Structure formats: C-alpha cells, structure tokens
Amino acid sequence: RFRFTLTTNGVLLNDEVQEFVNREMDNVVLSIDGRKEVHDRMRPFRNGKGSYDLVLPKFEKLAESRNQEKYYVRGTFTKNNKDFSNDVLHLADLGFKQISVEPVVGSDEEDYALQAEDLPEIFAEYDKLAAEMVNRYHTDKDFNFFHFMLDLTGGPCVAKRLSGCGSGTEYLAVTPWGDLYPCHQFVGEEKYLM
C-alpha cells in the first residue's frame, strides 16, 4: 500500500480540496512559518502582501477536521527568526498539536542563511522548547514537536533512525508537474530527477 503525504502552502485550500485531502491523504503538511511577521516576510504574494491571514484559518480548519492527527504544521527558521521557539509556541497557542519548525536549507550566501556562529542561539532555543513542552504537558496547550519525538520503547521509529530518512527505500517526492525525485530536498536539481 502506498501512503501519500501532501504538502501545501494553503493558498488554494478550500472545502473541496480539504474533503479530498481528508479522504485520500495519509498525512498532510501545512506550510506556515509561525508568527505573522515571520511568515509574511518569507511567503509574500507577488504583490508583496503576506499570506498569513489567508492561510491560517484554512490550516486551523484542516487540523480540526483531522482531529489534530495525521498532519503537522511545518515552518522554517532562518537568520531572521533565530528565536524560533516563539514561532513554535505561537503555533501551539493557536491550537496546533503537531508542529515542526526546521532550519533553512540553502546557500550560505543568502541573507537568511544560518551560519556556524548562530548555533549557540539555536541550541538555546531548543532548550527553551524542551522546557516549555514539559511545562505544557497534560494541559490544553500541549503539543508535539517533531524533533523531540523519540521512540524509547523500540517501536517502528528505531528502524527508521537506523536506515535513515527513507530516500531511496520508502520515500519519493512528486512535483506538481509529475517530476520524481528521491527526496523533496533534491527537487529542482536535474541530476536527481528520476
């Protein structure tokens, strides 16, 4: 059986698409970077206007329609929001339970690129998140943060950690144009086009 995950920026999400996603997709990734100012800076429309106010209510509705399961909100932190624990907590305060905010991947020359000297600040943010997760445990504001989800009982996640990310064994990225890549990180790189 194939499992399908859809990643969406939410712009074209409507009731019909939501119904399809809930019926056909095993998982859905809702791409939002956290606080309004952070999201709008990195995800503007062509006219320069931010997309946060348009996509947030759609994402809240979709997460609820999936009973806060089988989805996650996925953001990216950059040099411009090294205080990304605030973005994670913003999303949790909005009611999202499944959250992943990950470091940007890109050229070191980009003005938003993270550098080695940023690591102490980044590590401190992870410490803040860990403490806040403990504080919120068993409250109505608790949440799962993807990077802290460890399987200490030896379940199926152990095999995944040993075999890697799944690229080439159980994972395939499909672009809107039907191009196939072994991983979403390789999309657009001609040498990885399958």
Where are these regions (language model features)?
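Radical SAM enzyme [4Fe-4S]-AdoMet core and its adjacent flexible, acidic
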Residues: E37-E60, E64-W177, V187-L193
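Conserved SAM/AdoMet-binding glycine-rich loop
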Residues: R1-K36
